[in-house]
């Protein structure tokens, strides 16, 4: 997709002009000045939602004086070389008492009125609306709010890029590659690259690096998100939408806290997300909280016992925007962070040896949540324009690929390590790019978790499986094998030709050769071995981590089949709830439908277990499918249990279908009610429009059947009946 550095000036000029032309269209569309239907009428989009193959517009059309496609202009690096800046640890969010929140959190949405800013679309001078954007009333009230009343609060604000003067990596400078936390951090991908403008990048708190929240089981949390983005829809730097909805991927809680794509809120509002932080199955399994394996870490080194099944313990989540039709743009723009969960089994203290704590690499200074040797890594490919400002292109609906690799928001950094074991929590936060990761010397890595769930048993690998968008792999690397002064690199072997799928998984030597036309291939993170540890490494990787829940006594009540493909069509017309694009999902033998968050596609009964078959209907693409709400187990790949590799034998929430492939999963629907989602996490596919709504049926008052659809406006959320209910849903 991207032109090589030695491309002719004429091709570079044509490519830049074409991108500029596309950016004008993108700006008009993202700011609501023109609709997708208008683009089709003007002959700029096909009915399938792809850009017309037209010279001066499409990067894939021949130019006026050449039969060679113009391609995309490479992101300028302004002379910056790889591995010349330290990788920053993620920025730790402050944990405060709930009493510090004003106004205090409430079970139902806070409908206190405020005067609205007339720059908001559809707002007249003097209009008022609620201060909280959560839909009002009992259906969207926090479930189990009093049972799990919040004990800790984390408060964030979505803002445009600005300098970070309060950076908190959670570790001393010596364990953060020498970064001085007191030094201001400008909004740059490298110290020698330009500052990002306030509307080029939007992040939580408006600052670099991305944020990290620490939670523990047994300490319910209130996550208050303020929308501080520009009031005017036009102030977006050319892409992104200022209405947002925050998804905790993949939290087990009520739907009102899930970041439903249609429950978005506006600048000037906040939304309170309540995280019970207890274990799945808490209503029927270990309800008296007597099992010491089921719990969180106490401040004295002990355990806070919680109800639920300890086999459902999770370790790594992330949070990101889920705005309908704009998820790819908003997440790419910076609205994403990570969450670490600590438990009785995984306390973040490697010294506690009580027969329950697994003692994974972390540290020992604090009772729980040590980050010394527990490192978050957020991977994303980016691109920027000739001025160095973040750039995005919606017109390749196969999936946007960047040509610059970033780790924790930094262009190809280095990270200093000691000669001991480290745990790395790796997240693919890209739009469409997959990663296949190896170390440059092919040394072994121990995979301990998949999608935030510790595996039943660790798996030793020299090359990780493809890491799909939104998947999380946790690995342990032992750097004691290297001498002080040594270096080793993380390498990406997955070569893309477009955003549909990985074209080739290269050999390590091929990836290191520098000959791949894909700029995302090769070294992206340098480890520098700088010293021996000051104290002995007390961490371990036990042979048994967290076994899967026993489902043998849980009957299967229903099987459903979902087919994901490029034959999407739309049967509804509501401009707020319905999307359009080439991608769609077929349910139980029906046609592939574009997204409509007002359509009910499935409604499993509360307290039951189902089997879902997820099918990719083509060989030309891959889809990482995310099912919200509760972790699932993979029963089969392509119809056979023997095709499930060891690293997929734990619980998961993202399922790479692979070209022409299928994945059969089983899931329980318990504890909470409401409406949830299932979608492709190639967020370009999701936005164009591979997403469906499902809801939990018969979960008791106040829920009704079917649930009304929320329609957010600055003046308040209203409700309407579903646009459509598929015949096989209930």
PLM segments and residue spans:
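Histidine- and aromatic-enriched segments that form or immediately flank copper-ligand environments
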Residues: 141-342, 346-351, 433-468, 488-508, ...
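Short, cationic motifs built from Arg/Lys/His that form the positively charged side of catalytic pockets
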Residues: 36-37, 425-428, 560
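Intrinsically disordered, low-complexity segments enriched in small residues
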Residues: 30-33, 52-54, 316
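Histidine- and aromatic-rich segments of cupredoxin/plastocyanin-like copper-binding domains
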Residues: 250-279, 379-543, 548, 642
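Bacterial Sec-dependent N-terminal signal peptides
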Residues: 26, 45-50, 54-75, 367
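N-terminal secretory signal peptides
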Residues: 1-38, 47, 60-63
């Amino acid at each position: 997709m991207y032109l090589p550095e030695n491309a002719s000036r004429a091709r570079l000029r044509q490519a830049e002009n074409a991108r500029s032309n596309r950016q004008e269209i993108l700006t008009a569309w993202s700011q609501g000045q023109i609709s997708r239907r208008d683009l089709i009428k003007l002959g700029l989009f096909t009915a399938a939602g792809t850009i017309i193959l037209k010279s001066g517009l499409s990067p894939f059309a021949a130019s006026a004086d050449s039969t060679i496609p113009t391609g995309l202009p490479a992101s300028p690096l302004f002379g910056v070389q790889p591995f010349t800046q330290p990788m920053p640890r993620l920025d730790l969010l402050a944990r405060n008492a709930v009493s510090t929140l004003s106004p205090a959190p409430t079970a139902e949405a806070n409908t206190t009125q405020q005067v609205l800013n007339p720059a908001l679309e559809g707002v007249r001078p003097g209009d008022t609306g609620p201060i909280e954007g959560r839909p009002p009333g009992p259906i969207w009230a926090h479930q189990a709010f009093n049972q799990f009343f919040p004990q800790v609060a984390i408060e964030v604000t979505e803002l445009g890029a600005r300098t970070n003067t309060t950076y908190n990596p959670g570790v001393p400078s010596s364990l953060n590659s020498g970064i001085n936390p007191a030094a201001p951090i400008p909004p740059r991908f490298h110290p020698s690259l330009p500052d990002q403008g306030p509307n080029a990048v939007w992040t939580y708190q408006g600052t670099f690096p991305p944020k990290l929240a620490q939670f523990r089981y047994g300490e319910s949390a209130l996550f208050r998100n303020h929308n501080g983005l520009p009031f005017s829809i036009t102030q977006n730097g050319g892409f992104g939408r200022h209405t947002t909805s925050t998804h905790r991927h993949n939290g087990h809680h009520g739907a009102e806290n899930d970041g439903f794509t249609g429950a978005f809120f506006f600048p000037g509002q906040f939304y309170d997300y309540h995280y019970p932080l207890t274990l799945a199955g808490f209503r029927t399994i270990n309800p008296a909280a007597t099992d010491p394996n089921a719990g969180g870490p106490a401040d004295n080194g002990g355990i806070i016992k919680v109800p639920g099944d300890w086999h459902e313990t999770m370790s790594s989540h992330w949070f990101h925007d889920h705005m309908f039709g704009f998820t790819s743009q908003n997440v790419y723009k910076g609205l994403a962070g990570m969450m670490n969960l600590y438990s009785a089994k995984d306390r973040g203290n490697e010294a506690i040896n009580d027969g329950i704590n697994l003692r994974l690499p972390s540290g020992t200074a604090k009772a729980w949540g040590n980050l010394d040797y527990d490192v978050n890594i957020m991977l994303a490919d980016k691109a920027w324009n000739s001025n160095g400002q973040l750039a995005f292109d919606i017109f390749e609906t196969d999936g946007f690929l960047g040509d610059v690799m970033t780790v924790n928001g930094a262009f190809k950094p280095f990270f200093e390590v000691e000669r001991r074991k480290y745990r790395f929590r790796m997240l693919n936060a890209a739009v469409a790019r997959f990663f296949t990761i190896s170390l440059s010397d092919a040394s072994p890595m121990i995979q301990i978790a998949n999608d935030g769930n510790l595996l039943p048993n660790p798996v030793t690998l020299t090359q990780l499986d493809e890491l799909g968008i939104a998947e999380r792999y946790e690995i342990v690397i032992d750097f004691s094998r290297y001498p002080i002064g040594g270096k080793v690199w993380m390498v990406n072997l997955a070569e893309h030709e477009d955003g549909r799928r990985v074209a080739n998984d290269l050999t390590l030597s091929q990836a290191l050769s520098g000959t791949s036309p894909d700029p995302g291939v090769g070294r992206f993170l340098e480890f520098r071995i700088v010293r021996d540890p000051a104290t002995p490494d007390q961490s371990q990787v036990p042979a048994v981590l967290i076994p899967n829940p026993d489902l043998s006594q849980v009957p299967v009540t229903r099987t459903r089949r979902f087919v994901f493909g490029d034959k999407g069509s739309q049967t509804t017309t509501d401009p707020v709830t319905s999307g359009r694009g080439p991608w769609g999902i077929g349910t139980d033998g029906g046609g592939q439908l574009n997204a409509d968050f007002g359509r009910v596609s499935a409604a499993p009964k509360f307290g039951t277990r189902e089997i879902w078959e997820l099918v990719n209907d083509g060989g030309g693409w891959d889809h990482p499918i995310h099912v919200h709400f509760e972790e699932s187990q993979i029963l089969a790949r392509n119809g056979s249990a023997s095709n499930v590799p060891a690293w997929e034998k734990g619980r998961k929430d993202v399922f790479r279908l692979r070209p022409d492939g299928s994945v059969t999963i089983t899931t329980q629907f318990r504890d909470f009610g409401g409406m949830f989602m299932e979608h492709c996490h190639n967020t370009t596919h999701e936005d164009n429009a591979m997403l469906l709504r499902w809801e939990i049926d018969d979960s008791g008052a106040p829920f009704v059947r079917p649930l009304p659809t929320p329609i957010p406006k600055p003046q308040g959320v209203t409700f309407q009946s579903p646009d459509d209910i598929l015949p096989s849903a209930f």
